Amino acid sequence: MIKIVYDIKVYREGLRDIVKEDDVVVELGCHVGNSTRIISQMAPYGRIISLDKSSQSEEKMQELTKEEGSLIEFIKGDVRLHEVLEEVAEKVNKIGGCDVLSIDLGGGYHPDTAFKVFFIWSSTLKPRETIIRNRGLLDFIHSSTSSEIINSNYGWLESCGDDGIPTRLKELKLWSPKL
């Protein structure tokens, strides 16, 4: 299942609904760890790999990691970079795969970036569930119509098949460094 929300309370409630006690969760855009803390409560026997590129996240996530022990691993990195995806994919494969992909990249901004990150990461990790917090994507979905029906039952687009880690996209070089 792929769930798209905007309101932070709805996002965190969605996490409570989908995260199971032994899940492996990859969290893209953890910021200072408020949602990470909720995930750790829902998955006390699981693993959480949380990523963020902001300087504010590093200190707070180190504190949270000390509190929670080996349950949480924080990686300071830009989720748009191929090397970061490769690093996380390797870690996830060693621990048995990704159950939940959680994406919160600024909430209301850059729906194109949120979708590209979702597409590349979910195509690679093939999670059972994905939750994305982004106002632009939610607005797009509710403002759109289609006469065609294509469904995916998992947290990734099944129409992607088994492509694995996508090759480097030239388009990624065009993304704004301000994100």
Segments (PLM) and residue ranges:
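Conserved class I S-adenosyl-L-methionine
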Residues: 22-31
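Glycine-rich SAM-binding Motif I of class I
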Residues: 33-37
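Gly/Ala-rich phosphate-binding loop of Rossmann-like dinucleotide-binding domains
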Residues: 40-41
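Conserved SAM-binding motif I beta-strand of class I
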Residues: 47-52
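Short SAM/SAH-binding signature in class I
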Residues: 92-105
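C-terminal substrate-binding/active-site "lid" region of AdoMet-derived donor-dependent transferases
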Residues: 107-179
